[in-house]
Structures are given as structure tokens and as C-alpha cells.
Amino acid sequence: MIQNLQRKDSQWTPFILPDLISIQRDSFLLFLERGLATELSHVTPLTGSHFRITLCSHGYRLKRPKVSIQEAVYQATSYSAALYVNVETNQSNLGTQETQIQSVWMGDIPLMTSRGHFIINGSSRVVVNQIVRSPGIYFKEMIDQKHRRMFQASIISNRGSWVRLETDVDGMIWVRMDKAKKISILIVLEAMGLSKKTIFRSLKSPEFLFKALQQLLAKKRWQDKVYELIPQSTTDALFHLYTKLSPDKPGNTLTARRVLYEKLMDAKRYDVGLVGRVKLNKKLKLPVPEHVHTLRPVDFLAATDYLIGLEYGRGQVDDIDHLKNRRVRCAGELIQSQLRIGLNRLERTMQGRISRPGELPGMSSLMNPKPVMAALREFFGSNPLSQFMDQTNPLAELTHKRRLSSLGPGGLSQDRAGMAVREIHPSQYGRICPIETPEGPNAGLIGSMATYARLNQYGGLECPFYQVVEGKVLYEFGPIFLTAEQEDQVTVVAGDILDQRKLMVAVAEGRDPLDPAVRPTLPDRPLILRSRQEFHTGSFRDVNYVGIAPTQMISVATSLIPFLEHDDANRALMGSNMQRQAVPLLKTEAPIIGTGLEAQVAADAGGVVQSPFEGIVVYVDATRIVVSTSKSKLALSKKRKIHESNVFLQVYQRSNQGTCIHQRPIIPLHTPVIRGDLLADGSSTSGGQIALGKNLLVAYMPWEGYNFEDAILISERLIYDDLYTSLHIERYEVETQHTKLGPEEITKSIVHETDDKLPYRWLDERGIVMRGAWVEPGDVLIGKITPKEEKELTPELRLVYAIFGKRPKGFRDTSLRVPQGVRGRVVDVRMIRDEDTKVVHVYVCQQRQIQVGDKMAGRHGNKGIVSRIVPRQDMPYLQDGTPVDMVLNPLGVPSRMNVGQVFECLLGLAGQRLGQQLKVRAFDEMYGAEASRHLVYNKLHEASEVTGHHWLFDPNHPGKSRLIDGRTGDMFDQAVTIGQAYMLKLIHQVDDKIHARATGPYSLITQQPLGGRSKRGGQRLGEMEVWAFEGFGAAYTLQELLTVKSDDMQGRNEIMSAMVQGRQLPEMGTPESFKVMIRELQALCLDIGIYHRSKMTFKTEEIDLMQMR
């Protein structure tokens, strides 16, 4: 009913949303175009007595991948391109110079797909953007225990030693490098080549250092160590610096100079990068060229001057959590840094090979790509920033690609991150979402980019604003993107103060939206302005910039929540996170109450299929759509040819999380299309919009206690109409191997006369299950035999086999069977052949209906577990006879403060009755106080008038209605809030969680049952549970749990046989964990044993642990 309804807008934003995954694609493109060349240019040429080998940074090429993206997934390989680099060899032989250029294979570079992820070993992976401290110099103030003030300057680099300048209580400035002892700034500066005269003349306040030196020299302990403060010469300074940096190694002036150069001035070992140099120059007002990425003496001199200025009250300390001091490292930059590691390893390998005596080895053996490939494989396989892509639904995929993580190499760790790093900083407005972050130890460390945010060339986050002049918003100049630092210098106002009603009317009537008469202006009343991270009140004349949209401060997932401003932030966080956990349903349905971003999220996440160009649809089936267009053959001729493009659809494919990826065509044949038109819907979209759940008729009321504590009561209509039925595809794999007794074999010839043939019924002649077969638990998916060792036969058996012509079984059946609890249809079978092995993948699709124990949630953090499924005739029903689909607990609203769900369900009811879909964007108070309430009441009143059902809007209790009990036919005593809510079914399903254990595996050391469903484990009886048994005096039950049900090895075997044979249960023995504890104490050289004292002789005898019962 809702599918073809009209979507009505309640707001209009002139600025179109950017491509939401461009951050991934742009970064990788930059790596291919510039990053590769940069890293190749940093490889040092190899020189010998008569040759020179150079890697050319230009002319490299990438070959087209051998397999397509889909084939890479099926064959469990990586989607990558071979990198070929030109290598120039200059050889001098008997006075002649020979130059040869060869194209050498340098390994395979994984390629990013058009959707912004990688295919590594058949699995989709995402490289998460890392937000780190930007390279540069940072000043901070420190207070010691005696409340004395000191200052510190930290120089952060991309690569190399960390350097810190700090003042002490006497005012002296010291330098620390890595873990070396502190060194006087005068020694460092003079060792770098500056004279004392230059140093003191360059400082604005040299008297500060003079005074500090006088105070130190007045102290006894420094009178004999003057050389540690003031060097006599440059040589003296170099030698003293070397003794501090390498105290255990003897050296001379030349060695000291080399160590200093390698520490701070060697571009291969120390690098502040372009961003670091720009920040150093800006902070210290230096004229150093931007291509110089190492430290210079002038950097130390200017940092010293700034530190002295801080002591005199000049300058400012830095806020390290401000976004101007942080930058984002995207996929391309992270891969580039890993490629650098691989090239450095290759360089060392090549140096080692050419240093051997003999002829110059061949180029293919010299340029072995293994170090480069190993480095990339290590990054994609084990780096915490390379993650298994969340493919539960398109929104989860999109959010994963826009994630910002402070963790990973070069970042923070969960243990060391304090509250200051995790908290919301004012500079994050419009750049990082203040709501969407995980719950738990990663809270605040992992975030999500705001909807309109983008990255600049330095990795800084920028936010768009419209410029304002004298209260007029300059739309015609488009949005201006500001960094956090630039935003601090101007006065801005939020985008939710613009009244856009005139603009919407003009757009609806087809008039120019930039007409001064209709475009929004700032209101002539006191406004809440923001400048330098502080709020204050002012007039529209003080405003420099205005936000482009009310939702620009939040992320994509959060902006999909209607009436967000009426929800508590904690519940909005849960709602944002749980939308990503929604399972794609068999029958999709777009929400009645949306926010307007549903279509763009579906398109940018790759959830729908769009036309690649303008043309006409000439062929449609379940697997492909053909779009035909005409292209001119020659520019000057009139001849034209037809160009056809095949758009292939994904059909019943498995996602990383086991959900079903399926695209179905919705475009009719012979339909003209333009570029970007919708051709096919995905498994989580409806009509091109993201559709993660269903619109249900809900009632907020208690029902026999079945919705106590967030439990959810549902109607059986949800099952019979397949409203929440979802498809889940599981992949089962078999690999044949060569054993020492012979090769394993996939075959159908396993069944013997005495065997049950039923489980083998679906195998084809190859021994692999047929596609389309319906399989049950225990059915054989792949028939496989493994050779086993034959026993020596007796003469009698040999005679029997000779008479009847039978041979003994020389193999055992190791077939792959359907596990317990799984039944479904085989949707695909794939075979991958290698030189020695054969791998077969079987994909089984399960259809899961909603059941008791499944988790459901709304978009406002209102989550719960299905507790009971009630016949539809027993559910409460409306006054027109419509039974309610779901009953929720009304006590779940007031304390959680997520009132947005009430607004949503009431407006949804009005929209459903009027046949409308409504787009309601957040922060609508610009239209007046209580704007949401007025909108809801107006729509409910309109619905009651249009339909004639006046009970939809009762002025005595608006938003509520009298319900009738389906069991008795009596009307409930009080009016109940009813409405259409958009409810999601989450991936936390009872089928994946329910588990029971009778007997199973035990730990090898403690002999106690393992834990967890995957290991067929049991439930742990912990310390507090033991106390509970003790408190109730249940001694025998406790003894049984701690012994035969746990780690009394002999006892558990005896008790099982006793129960089977009906004998009396034996006595309990000693737990194995007790023996382990005694052995561990003995391993600590403690003489501890177990002794028995005889009652008759009173003699004490030691009991052997191994013989102990």
C-alpha cells in the first residue's frame, strides 16, 4: 500500500549532498597517481664499481586485473593489479657506457572497487580512516607538585625520533630526544652549527637564558659541570651530544655529526611531512621552504624563542584535542606508508645481493617482489585498520567506510586514552558526529564523519557554510568550506534559524530559488552566535557564515532518525548503531516517516543499481539488464552505431555477515533512462530508498506482563505474512589434501549396501550437492573419502573376501554434512582447482521467520526481545476492527527520554491513513516552538477528517485512542497511544545464540568443559554462583557440579555408565583443577603435597597425585 505513495517535503536545502564514499575513492586515486611515484623516487639508486641501478619514478604501469571482482570473491583470491616499474641500468665496460631500461614486475597492488572497499582472499575489507595528531609543534603548560609553572614543546613527526623542548623551574631550556637524557638547548643549537652570538642575537628575550644560566651556576652541583650547560666550541657540543645520545658507544666528532644528521636531518629516517612543515612554519613564523621535511637549526631556535615568550605571557599553548591539531590518514596514505616499508626491505635485499662478489645478477632475481608483496599482505591481513567489512545492510557498509578511528599504529590505545580525548570537542561541529560512536571501551575513540564534511589536501576536516553579508545569505556563490582553525576566526550561526517556507513555495511553483524575494534571510532578532568555540548572543549583522543545513553536524546514520531532537543523545546513539544491525527482509518497505536522505544513502552505498548512461532498456531478466544507446562512429560522418551495456545484478549472494545480497530489476522493458536512473532495487531498498524494516501498527500498553522490561509482544500476522522473514546464506567449504596414505577424493561412491542412502540423495555424479536441492540436518553436501591405514587381515578374512569378491574399506567417510539446526536450499556451488588441491564451496540459503528470542528495535534506541507471539484475534484492536501488530511497554519511554518514537508513530498513523509518506528533517523549531507537536496534531486531525474516523484525533486526549481487548471484546479502561512505527529486525537472532551441552570437549590442562557456543562449551559455574549454592546449603548439588559435571575425569566416566546401566551412582572424586593447582605450587619450589593420616596407627603417608581418586 505504501509503495507508490507521494513523498511530501517539509524542508528544502539548496546544497546537494556530496558523494558519501568519495573519501575512500579519492584517497586511493591520489595514491595511484602520486603516492606510488613518490615512494619509488625515495628508493636509493644502487651503485657498484661499474654499474648503477635506478628505479624510475615515472612510467610505472598497472596491468588490468586477471579476474573480475565477482570472480575474485568466488575464487577466494584478491582483486589486484600487477605493478610494473621501469628500472634503468647504467653499466660501464672498457670505457663504454651502456644504458638499459627494463620493465620489472614489482608485485600486485590490491585495487579498490568503485564502492570503496578491497577484495582480499575473497573477502570484502575496508581500510578505516585514522584520525591522529597532526605532525608539527605543540606547546603545553605543566604545573608541578609545588604549583610551579613550566612549559613544554613537542615536535611530532611522521617518521623518526620524537623531540621535546622543556623549561625547568630555574628557567633553563632542555632538549629530550627519544629516551636519552636531557641536553641543554645551547649544546644542541651549537652542535647544529649556530654560534653563541647568533643564538643570543636571534632571541627576542636573551636575558631569560642568561638569568637561567646564572641561577643554575650558582648551585653547587652545576659548578663542576659547566660543559653540560655551555659548550666551549662546536666540536665540544657535538661530542657532548653524542655521549648523551649513545652513552655506551665510543665515538669521535665525525661519528657525532653523523648521528645528529641521522636523528634529525636525514630525510630517510626523519620526516615531518608537508603538513608538519606547514604547521611549523605557521606556528613559529618561519620562511623554510615547504619541500624541506626535516628539522633545521632555525626550527629549534624559533621553538626556543616561543618557549621564552610563553614564560613572558606571549603566545598561546595548544589544545591538542582541537581538530586543527589533528588530521585524517585515509586508505591511500596508509597503503603508501606500508608500501614504503616494503620498498625499504627490497632496497636492503638488493644491497645484500649486489655486495656479493661475482657478476651482476639478473634483474628479475635482483628485483624480487616478495618483500613488497609481504608488506602489503601484512597490512591488509593483520593491521587493525584493515577490517572485515560490515555488510549487514547498505547503511552498515556506508558507515564503515566513513568511520574515523583514533586506534591503530601511530594512534591511541584503549588503555592509555583518557576522558579528554574521548569527549566531544567544540571544533568537531559539522566535521565529526557527536552522537554516533560505539558503546563500551571504544566510546569516543571511534567516530563517524558528519554528513557534509570533507577532507582537504592536508588531511584536515572541513565543514561547509554559506557566507553572510549584512544578514543576506549569498547562496549564489555556493558553500564555502572552512577548517576548524578558520572557523575559530569568524562568527557562525547554526543552519536551523533560516525560515525556508517561502523558498519551498517558490520551488513548488517553479520559480527561481535565488530570487531575493523568496530566499531565506537571517531573522532580525537576537541570535545565538558561535565564535572561538564560545556561544554568545548578537544580531544578524555580526554573522559571517551560516550553516547550510540543520543536519550538517550529525552523521549519515543519525540523520536517518526522524524527530531526532526529541531523543536523548544516549538513545540516539543506540538508534544510530542498531540501524546498522538491521537484517535485510524478504519483502522490503520504505518508512512512512523518513528524513529525505534514504535515497542518497541507498545509491552511495551501492544498495541499488543505476543506469550507467542515457539510453533505452532493451532487455531485462533476473541476472542482467541491457541498456542501449547510440554513439557517433565518426565526428564528421552521419553514421551511427548502437552501443549496448550489460548491467549485471547480484543474485542470492552471501555478505560477510551471512545476510543475503540480492538485486531485483524494477525497470520495465523499453523504458528510456538517463544516467543515474534507478534500474534495480537491492535487498535493503524499496523504490530506490533505504528500507531496513517494516511499518507496524503499535500500541503502548501493558499486556499480561509479557512486555515487562522491554520485552515485545507481536502478532502472528508478522509470521504468516512473512513481514519479518529474512534470508541468510551460509558458506560451507571442503578442501581435498594429500595425506601420507594418498590423496583425499571427492566422490559419490561412498554409499554401501548397509548404509542409509537418504543423506546422499542430492549428490551429483561428481559427489557434490546439486544446486537447488533442499537440504536438512545430516544431509551430505560434499562426499569425500580420506585414505586410512589398512589393518592386517587374518587368513580367514582374506578367504571370505576372495570368495565374495569384496575388498576391505581402505578409506573413511569424511563427507561434509549439513549441521544441526540448519535447513535450506542450495543456491550456489563453486569449485576452485589448484595444482594439488581442490576446494569446493557450497552456499545454503536459510529462510528465517521472526520467533521468540529475536531482537527488534526502532530508530530511537527502543530495543527489545520478542517474548510472545499472540494470535491476531487475541491482540487488541482499533475501533475500526484493525488488530494491533505489536504491543510495547509504555514505561520504556519516560525514563529513556526518547520521545521521538511517539512523534514518529503518531505521524506515521496519520501518513498511513492519508496515503502519504512524509520527510521530516531534524531540528524543526525554526518554524516556531512546539513545531513537531503542531505538525503531528494537524496531520492527525486531517486524517480523521479525510477518513471519517474521528477517533483518530480526540481533543480530550490527542494522539490516543480507546482500544478493544481481542480476547473479551471489552474496551480497555484508558485511552492508549497507537501509531505506525518503523521497526527493525536485528542480526542478533536466537537461532545463532541458543545452545545446549550434554557432553562435549574439555580443556586439556584443567579438564574442565570449554566455554562458548562455537566450541560446544558449557556454562561456567563461577565464584559467585558457588556462594549462592553455599548460601542455600545445597551441598550435594554443589559437590556434583564441582566434580563429576566438571573435571573429575574418572568420576564423570563412571557416572555416565552407571546411569546408562541403572546402577547406583559412584562417589565423587577429586577435581583435576585441584591437582593442577598443587603441581603449580610445586613448580614454584614449594614443598606442598597431600597426606593421609591413619586412624589406627596415626602414621602420615603422602598420597601420589597421579594415583589419587
Swiss-Prot record:
It catalyses: RNA(n) + a ribonucleoside 5'-triphosphate = RNA(n+1) + diphosphate. Signal peptide: none annotated. Its main location: plastid. It comes from the Eukaryota. InterPro entries: DNA-dir_RNA_pol_bsu_ext_1_sf, DNA-dir_RNA_pol_su2, DNA-dir_RNAP_su2_dom, DNA-dir_RNAP_su2_hyb_sf, RNA_pol_bsu_bac, RNA_pol_bsu_CS, RNA_pol_bsu_protrusion, RNA_pol_Rpb2_2. Keywords: Chloroplast, DNA-directed RNA polymerase, Nucleotidyltransferase, Plastid, Transcription, Transferase. CDD domains: RNA_pol_B_RPB2. Belongs to the RNA polymerase beta chain family. DNA-dependent RNA polymerase catalyzes the transcription of DNA into RNA using the four ribonucleoside triphosphates as substrates. In plastids the minimal PEP RNA polymerase catalytic core is composed of four subunits: alpha, beta, beta', and beta''. When a (nuclear-encoded) sigma factor is associated with the core the holoenzyme is formed, which can initiate transcription. This is DNA-directed RNA polymerase subunit beta. It comes from Nephroselmis olivacea (Green alga). The lineage of its organism: Eukaryota, Viridiplantae, Chlorophyta, Nephroselmidophyceae, Nephroselmidales.
